[in-house]
Amino acid sequence: MHILIVNNTSIPVQKYGGTERVIWWLGKQLVKMGHQVSYLVAPGSYCDFAGVHVLDHNIPFNQQIPAGVDVVHLNCKVNETPKIPYIITLHGNTNDQAPLDINTVFVSKNHASRYGSASFVHNGIDPADYGDPGLNQSRNYFHFLGDAAWRVKNLRGAIKIAQKAKISLRVIGGKRFNLNQGIRLTFDPRIRFDGMKGGAEKNALLKGSKGLIFPVLWNEPFGLSIVESIYFGC
């Protein structure tokens, strides 16, 4: 089967990007199962196991579907409904009051139930991207993992928890200076900002962590950072 995976960002992900990681791993496993995979994604994308096409929102979507595609897997909004079989994965929460497409699938049971659905598929991770979890390694801090500029991830709350518990916190995914939120005046030496990290750098930080501090302010659809942290035993 020829499967077209569609998203409006580029692949492969370099640092932060849960959806990008999920569709990359999904495509890789589908190829291993014997399927043909193509991506329709943002400019600058490349892939060594599947074809890559550039998504252009100014062109009718159906004109961008490569010849021979059997099913379309949408991970973002497009400008028209596919004329061939398709499925939509909703990765986040939406405030749009319009009814969701009947082909929408969610990423957890709770996520689906909040939209009146029972259709969900959990995200997975590829252990090959993470390596040895270092379960016997010494650990001396906790971590926050996520886009700190996104208020619902509640970095402020994570810092307060760490300070009240008098523990060290590594902030993976945020900087001390943020033009959108102003200067974070966090002078506590136990709070360290590591910025956006990916690959080996992020893995090394997770290996040294005792646990994830994750006081989100919304209904988390899935939480890839939770699964990544569990993989490393923290």
Question: Residue ranges of each PLM-predicted region?
Answer:
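Nucleotide-activated donor-binding/catalytic signature segment of Leloir-type glycosyltransferases, i.e.
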Residues: Q181-A200
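N-terminal strand-loop element at the rim of the active site
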Residues: N7-G17, W24-F61
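Nucleotide-sugar-dependent
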Residues: Q14, E20, A149-K153, L217-L224
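Active-site proximal beta-strand in glycosyltransferases
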Residues: I3, D70-L74, P82-K109
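A short, active-site helix/loop in glycosyltransferases that binds the activated sugar's phosphate group
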Residues: N93, Q97-F120, I125-Y130, N154
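Acidic donor-binding loop of glycosyltransferase active sites
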Residues: F144, K207-P221, C234
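Conserved donor-binding/catalytic core segment of Leloir-type glycosyltransferases
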Residues: A118-N123, A128-I172
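Short alpha-helical segment that forms part of, or immediately flanks, the ligand-binding pocket
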Residues: N203, V227-Y231
